[in-house]
Amino acid sequence: MIKVAVTGALGRMGSNIIKTITQQEDMKVVCAFEVPNHPKKGEDVGELIGIGKIGVPLSTADELDKVLKETKPDVLVDFTIAHACVENVKIAAKNGVNLVIGTTGFTEEQKAEIEKAIKENNVAAVISQNFAIGVNIFFKTLEFLAKKLGDYDIEIIEMHHRYKKDAPSGTALRAAEIIKANRGIESVFVYGRYGMTGERKKEEIGIHALRGGDVVGDHTVIFAGDGERIELTHRASSRQAFVNGVILAIRYIADKKEGIYNTFDVLGLNEIKF
């Protein structure tokens, strides 16, 4: 039985992850965390997310070290915010807990802190901007298109619900990084355009963020050539698409001894070569 800790437990992703874990035969939630001084501290997490009692009281982030020592989870799943995630990773890694990290919006310095904590404590982690299985097929397809159509004009458009705090999305940035690594020419990211921008430069990859309504996550990459264009789109209609990938990542990382992995590793996509 895989024992799982969840931070951001009452958030949109955290609550859905907990619900789905309770439906699995090979894993269980042993502790769940929210922000310090949360008014629901101590209440049963299952009741708070509407699935009935599961025997796990809501803890707060300032108790993370103590509760991890008491419950001894195999994996901690983090969908919080960047600065909180960095601290959670440091504490979990020191306790020998493997990690599934879906938080986005990190600075380069924060990414380095996370990698350092994982490596220094010899734990294993799956880190991904998007755990949806379809999105990762989308990413793999982008590798192919960027290699074949790298000289086309490339634009990325993403849209999310009005509550999303960071822009552009981690998924859009990951798409841009994949294209940059595979298109065969130097690339620069251009975030939106306004005013007299001048003629579009060949090396540009445009990235545009839209916010509104209850959109779970839409991503489109446009490869525009002379007389034709290809548009590759992924639309998530439910957060369950992401949660299903998280469950696979938990199983993948639970017994790993060390190392940093991504969803391509989890899904076996690194074996596909173009």
From Swiss-Prot:
**What's the chief localization of this chain?**
cytoplasm
Q: In which pathway does it act?
A: Amino-acid biosynthesis; L-lysine biosynthesis via DAP pathway; (S)-tetrahydrodipicolinate from L-aspartate: step 4/4
Its recorded reaction(s) are:
(S)-2,3,4,5-tetrahydrodipicolinate + NAD(+) + H2O = (2S,4S)-4-hydroxy-2,3,4,5-tetrahydrodipicolinate + NADH + H(+); (S)-2,3,4,5-tetrahydrodipicolinate + NADP(+) + H2O = (2S,4S)-4-hydroxy-2,3,4,5-tetrahydrodipicolinate + NADPH + H(+)
Q: Carries keyword NAD?
A: yes
Q: Which residues bind (S)-2,3,4,5-tetrahydrodipicolinate?
A: H161, G170, T171
Domain of life from the UniProt record: Archaea
**Enzyme Commission number(s) of this protein:** 1.17.1.8
Example GO biological process: diaminopimelate biosynthetic process
Q: Does the keyword Metal-binding apply?
A: no
Q: Which InterPro entries match?
A: DapB_C, DapB_N, DapB_N_CS, DHDPR_bac, NAD(P)-bd_dom_sf
Q: Which GO terms describe its cellular component?
A: cytoplasm
User: What is the enzyme's class at the highest EC level?
Assistant: oxidoreductase
What job does this protein perform? Catalyzes the conversion of 4-hydroxy-tetrahydrodipicolinate (HTPA) to tetrahydrodipicolinate.
Family, as annotated: Belongs to the DapB family.
Name under which the protein is recorded: 4-hydroxy-tetrahydrodipicolinate reductase
Which gene holds the coding sequence for this protein? dapB
